[in-house]
Amino acid sequence: MDLVTTLLIAVGLAMDAFAVSISGGATLREERLRWAVIAGALFGGFQAGMPVLGWLGGMGLASFVGTYGPWIAFLLLALIGGKMIAEAVRGDGESVRFENGATVLLLLAVATSIDALAVGVSFAVLDTAIALPAITIGVVTFAFSAAGVLLGSAFGHIMGRKACIVGGIILVGIGLRILLEHLFF
């Protein structure tokens, strides 16, 4: 998988964490930089680790999937992206108060990284190495989450839902690209 595609996947996956970080950052009045680093580390760490777990689990499935891999990758990415878009349109909770502590952030990091687990399965099915994508996803998510906390503390809830919609569109688009490449190239 090329670097541009990997970066787009990373950005798409980071949008949930970005939206949560904006929302949480909007509640902060003190220690903004501290919370930005904590949120970035937790969200980035889980977003990097989950694709590896998905990839390890998906490697066992890859031999059974064969030529259906691109279809599975498309379906997973389209479902994940569609879910992100639907939740953003409905306004389902991405709201959190960081003042409740790091435990809340840990739970949110796990919850927002479940999508990355499914992406890891897609990488395995496509027989794609996982190290570079996992590192890229983690670094991008760290940066987006830290920036989200700082933006949220400065601008409030203006961007939260829009970020999830953009992330969902990116993931659906990547899934469609994988499928079209399989069908026509």
From Swiss-Prot:
Name of one Pfam family that matches:
Mntp
Q: Which domain of life is it from?
A: Archaea
Establish whether keyword Chaperone is in the entry. Answer: no
Q: Which UniProt keywords apply?
A: Cell membrane, Ion transport, Manganese, Membrane, Transmembrane, Transmembrane helix, Transport
Entry's localization field = Cell membrane
Report TM segments.
3-23, 36-56, 60-80, 104-124, 130-150, 165-185
The yes or no answer to whether the keyword Transport is present is yes
The entry's function note states: Probably functions as a manganese efflux pump.
Family membership noted in the UniProt record:
Belongs to the MntP (TC 9.B.29) family.
Name of protein: Putative manganese efflux pump MntP
Organism the protein comes from: Methanoculleus marisnigri (strain ATCC 35101 / DSM 1498 / JR1)
